[in-house]
Curated annotation (Swiss-Prot):
InterPro entries: Ppm1/Ppm2/Tcmp (IPR007213), SAM-dependent_MTases_sf (IPR029063), SAM_mthyl_Trfase_ML2640-like (IPR011610). Belongs to the UPF0677 family. It comes from Mycolicibacterium vanbaalenii (strain DSM 7251 / JCM 13017 / BCRC 16820 / KCTC 9966 / NRRL B-24157 / PYR-1). This is Putative S-adenosyl-L-methionine-dependent methyltransferase Mvan_1344. It is an enzyme of class 2 (transferase).
Length: 305
């Protein structure tokens, strides 16, 4: 189903299902014999969503031979990819709070459990913004698991296409204080103009000393949805009745690093393969034709004093 300007979702549908997919990846990465991350809530959250494709993935019941490259090496590279991505954003949180930032905003938080699993310094406030159905599901499920936030946790149930800055302020956000912003796995699901608006709003809300962690997928400019649809066909054949490529907004858009630099941020980009080296993981195959989004660049930015 094509995206619309006012579409909504829960963790089992549309864009929400991609959050469940990412959580399943975090669960697999956490179960690795030599884990880079530890997300004890990823697996129970995925199971609570109840999409059979992802529960079978957790149970090792998927027939990987149906995928174009379901070799053990390729599967491990995918698990490692989720591990290094998660660790990058975890480390950005740690670097920001070590520098004295006590206000963290996670945009489109999905099934992210950082407010519960990271060791936040005393006095840290973590705001999470996402669709109301996603926020309600995660908060209720984690409470049922007996999980407790490790920081002051302020969920903000709102669509990011609405006036989320006003909702953030209403939840207690203080724009006069530096903020650590996380926008993980979000940008490809925004139209190009909405991506610019997102960073305009972040900049307007960011005191000097604030930070941003996000990523940029260069392949989104000439994203081939038919190729992506063919690559994801086995997922549909195994029961995941969601057309993942239709959720993405392709086409020309601002380069995240250039756009943020133009807004006065000091920006650093790290290609995904460099993250593998940083965290001691074997280099994955070059993206080439195997990844319609190309080689993702992980971006961190700092607003100077």
């Amino acid at each position: 189903m094509a995206r619309t300007a006012d579409d909504s979702w829960d963790p089992a549908s549309s864009v929400g299902a991609t959050a469940t997919m990412v959580a399943a990846g975090r669960a697999a990465a956490s179960a690795d014999p030599d884990p880079l991350i530890n997300d004890p809530y990823a697996e129970p959250l995925v199971r609570a969503v109840g999409l059979s494709f992802f529960t079978k993935m957790l149970d090792g019941e998927l027939d990987l031979s149906q995928f174009a490259d379901g070799s053990p090496e390729r599967v491990q590279a995918m698990i490692d990819g989720m591990a290094v991505r998660t660790r990058f954003f975890d480390d950005c949180c740690g670097t920001s709070t070590t520098a004295g930032i006590t206000q963290v905003v996670i945009l489109a938080s999905g099934l992210d459990a950082r407010a519960y699993r990271l060791g936040w310094p005393a006095g840290t406030v973590v705001y999470e913004l996402d669709q109301p159905a996603v926020i309600e599901f995660k908060t209720r499920t984690l409470a049922g698991l007996g999980a407790h936030p490790t920081a002051t946790h302020r969920p903000v149930p709102i669509d990011l296409r609405e006036d989320w800055p006003a909702a953030l302020h209403a939840a207690g956000f203080d724009a006069s204080r530096p903020t650590a912003w996380l926008a993980e796995g979000l940008l490809i699901y925004l139209p190009p103009e909405a991506q610019d608006q997102l960073f305009d709003r972040i900049t307007a809300l960011s005191a000097p000393g604030s930070t941003i962690a996000t990523e940029y997928a260069p392949g989104i400019i000439d994203f081939d949805d038919e190729k992506a649809r063919a690559m994801s066909a086995p997922m549909r054949e195994m029961g995941l009745d969601i057309d993942m490529p239709s959720l993405v907004y392709a086409g020309t858009r601002s380069h995240v690093m250039d756009y943020l630099a133009g807004q006065g941020w000091e920006v650093t980009g790290v290609p995904r393969r460099e993250l593998f080296t940083r965290y001691g993981r074997p280099l994955p195959p070059e993206a080439g034709d195997t990844d319609p989004l190309g080689e993702i660049v992980y971006v961190s930015a700092h607003r100077p004093q």
